[in-house]
């Protein structure tokens, strides 16, 4: 690993139950953002783990994302396996990776939020495609989120009341298989 001079090094953290994931977290320091390039995973679903409440979907859902924690506010921002719109109709099955943004509530009164990029072909990425993903503090309380690859680009600003230039925080990168309605519980075999 390469560290910057005077960088605060990360420490071991307990894993959150309810999903399979590989997470790398920075130390707590005065960061401005994080970015990386990834080849989106090939997916093979467990036919024994179909979602009984959503025909065509599974109880396991892959995602690749960045995020962090600053000012007591947690963020997850990246790509998740999601439904798409085909000929104006939302698919029952999840068929592509789509950008998503999630933040927890903040002491300032900002509410928690979950949002996706519009369900449009120009914002769909597929297994095996290479993408660059980044989040950066561009102004106090504002992150810029960019996904770029395979001839497509998504870019947006995302309000996050805990994120401010010069504040101490941490950033992360995560590859996950989230499990529907299983947060905080032991992971299910898949």
Show where each model-derived region lies.
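Exposed, interaction-prone regions of secreted/extracellular proteins
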Residues: 1-190
């Amino acid at each position: 690993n390469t560290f910057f001079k005077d960088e605060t090094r990360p420490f071991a953290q307990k894993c959150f139950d309810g999903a399979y994931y590989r997470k790398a977290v920075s130390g707590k320091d005065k960061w401005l953002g994080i970015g990386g390039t990834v080849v989106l995973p090939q997916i093979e679903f467990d036919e024994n783990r179909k979602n009984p409440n959503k025909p065509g979907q599974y109880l396991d859902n892959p995602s690749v994302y960045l995020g962090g924690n600053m000012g007591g506010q947690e963020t997850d921002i990246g790509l998740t396996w999601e439904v798409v719109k085909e000929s104006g109709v939302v698919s029952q099955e999840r068929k592509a990776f789509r950008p998503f943004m999630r933040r927890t509530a903040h002491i300032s009164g900002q509410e928690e939020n979950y949002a996706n990029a519009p369900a449009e072909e120009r914002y769909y990425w597929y297994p095996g495609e290479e993408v660059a993903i980044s989040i950066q503090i561009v102004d106090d309380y504002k992150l810029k989120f960019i996904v770029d690859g395979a001839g497509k680009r998504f870019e947006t600003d995302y309000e996050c009341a805990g994120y401010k230039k010069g504040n101490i925080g941490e950033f992360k990168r995560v590859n996950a298989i989230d499990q529907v309605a299983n947060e905080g519980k032991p992971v299910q075999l898949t």
